[in-house]
Swiss-Prot record:
Present with 2760 molecules/cell in log phase SD medium. SUPFAM superfamilies: UBC-like (SSF54495). Coiled coil: none annotated. This is Ubiquitin-conjugating enzyme variant MMS2. GO terms for molecular function: ligase activity. It comes from the Eukaryota. The modification Phosphoserine is found at S71. It comes from Saccharomyces cerevisiae (strain ATCC 204508 / S288c). Residues 5-137 form the UBC core domain. InterPro entries: UBQ-conjugat_E2_core, UBQ-conjugating_enzyme/RWD. Heterodimer with UBC13. Keywords: Ligase, Phosphoprotein, Ubl conjugation pathway.
Amino acid sequence: MSKVPRNFRLLEELEKGEKGFGPESCSYGLADSDDITMTKWNGTILGPPHSNHENRIYSLSIDCGPNYPDSPPKVTFISKINLPCVNPTTGEVQTDFHTLRDWKRAYTMETLLLDLRKEMATPANKKLRQPKEGETF
């Protein structure tokens, strides 16, 4: 089976993100519509219910480097969040986060955003004290 070229893959993800075909709990799209390399993306995650994240909207930046989707994107929270997989100073999602560490070409930005949302809802993380809403890194 041949590999889909990077730009075709990103165009598929862009279309899905823009048309809202994904789950309502996360969204993503190009940070700059003129970015012909489709490198810089924005993402949002709606905090999971029954957690300290409930009713919060988290903003993230996603950097799909030249080797994406063979290599994972770099993901950084813009909204302050307290999670073990997020650098508390920079907001960057650590490379040892299971989805990044075990990255597969079939994974998408949506996969990553949904897995981060699931991480927020785990018993160990859903009660973690969070910064005031609206704070940024």
